[in-house]
């Protein structure tokens, strides 16, 4: 479920991606990267009921059988300088998750310089500052039923172009691709989203965690 503005789960809402025969499923909730809205989990003041998200697997005694909850929301900066995300959480019960991934998104309009490699340095610097100041528990509140070790906070970097978007500005034998494995934030990877109103031109390799790309004779790898 992705909303352009607000996304609200009512106090009695149940999202069930659990299973009795395999690994649990994935529930994705989020807002558009430039949204000023909120992802809200309500609580019933009378009964105390809160939304339930079930991603449990077949065997609750096997941690890796659990499913995944992915929250994709814009970043925020608090009055005290700490950083958070656009989530208002009065209480939500998460059942059986092996991990809860929080993608804290910032959108960059790169129309004036529509090259992925030329935009990553600034985005990486912003992401490192954001993660260093992150107060994730204050930003999300309490997601009950899941251990703290299941939380993963990672920066989402969305590069948007009003025209074409090209992976490499100057592709060559020595500049044949982008290796994202060097971009880590407390051990977590970035989540890179590329959007182009025109053409998305992949004129090199894009990898994370593999061997260094090998240049082709014309400098382009497809």
Residue ranges and their predicted role:
Residues 1-222:
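Extracellular and secretory-pathway beta-repeat/beta-biased strand scaffolds
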């Amino acid at each position: 479920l992705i909303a352009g503005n607000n996304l609200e789960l009512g106090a009695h809402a149940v999202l069930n991606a659990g299973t009795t025969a395999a690994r649990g499923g994935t529930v994705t909730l989020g807002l558009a990267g430039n949204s000023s809205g909120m992802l809200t989990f309500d609580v019933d003041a009378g009964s105390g009921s809160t939304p339930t998200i079930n991603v449990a697997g077949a065997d609750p005694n096997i941690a890796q059988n659990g499913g995944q909850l992915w929250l994709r929301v814009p970043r925020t900066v608090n009055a005290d300088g700490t950083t958070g995300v656009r989530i208002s959480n009065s209480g939500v019960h998460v059942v059986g998750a092996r991990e809860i991934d929080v993608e804290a998104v910032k959108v960059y309009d790169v129309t004036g310089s529509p090259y992925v490699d030329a935009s990553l340095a600034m985005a990486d610097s912003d992401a490192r500052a954001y993660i260093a100041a992150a107060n994730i528990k204050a930003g999300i509140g309490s997601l009950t039923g899941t251990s703290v070790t299941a939380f993963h906070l990672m920066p989402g970097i969305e590069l948007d172009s009003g025209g074409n978007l090209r992976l490499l500005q100057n592709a060559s034998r020595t500049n044949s691709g982008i290796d994202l494995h060097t971009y880590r934030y407390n051990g977590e990877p970035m989540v890179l989203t590329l959007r182009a109103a025109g053409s998305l031109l992949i004129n090199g390799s894009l990898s994370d965690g593999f061997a260094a790309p090998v240049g082709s004779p014309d400098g382009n790898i497809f």
